Amino acid sequence: MDAHPDCGACAPKLHSWYDSDRFEYAGAAGGRIDRWGYPFCRGRRLSRTEEDHGQYDTPADVFWATGACLMTRSVLWRRLGGLDSRFFAHMEEIDYCWKLQLDGYKVCCVPQSVVYHLGGGTLPKTSPWKLKLNFRNGLLLLENNLARTFAAQGEPPRKALRHANRVIFWRKCLDGCSAAVYLLSGRKDFFKAVLEAHREARNLVSRPDIEALACQAKTSGVAGRYGGSIILASLLKGKRVFDYIESKMVL
């Protein structure tokens, strides 16, 4: 951090406590995000994690750094208000890292450091509440930051807001498809969790207004955004997905 004043936050590689040679779901080798706001990681595609063979041992700018072990500058933490309390337990570090980038700072993965993480300690993967938080907070993430990102890239405020609204609409449609799959497969508790997530998100949303977008500082880009769908890319490219995605990153 001392050697790189433009770095606002950094994190190590995250390995599984149970399988020490394998990346851990909550951060792996640094986080990315796709066009629709679905987060993923280098070393993690969908729910599958890779073994660490040194394939991500070069320090890299990433979109988000894991909240399991995050170092950030105290002055930036105070200025940005820390973690958004509306998120609770899921994706709040992604929201914070996105704000850091919009403030002109980088987020980095430092693979020379490795931390072993006990995943699922707060909520198990099978919890409908966990699923609800993931879907709800995914929408909050986009509402908080997407219009600001388009404004930072030079779009006029009203155009940036319309652009963000279109993306969020399609994200909601994709969530609806997931809900339908849960219902048809008999997982009614998961189906209800998605519906509840969208209902809660509507009540929690606080969008930036036109004046705030007009004041948004322009940036050279937000690192770690993939312009396509991580779900589609993973299905089509399999184990080669990260080589493909790295060539398609948008700034």
Annotate each predicted stretch with a short phrase.
Residues 194-251:
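Membrane-interface aromatic/basic loop that binds lipid-linked glycans or pyrophosphate carriers
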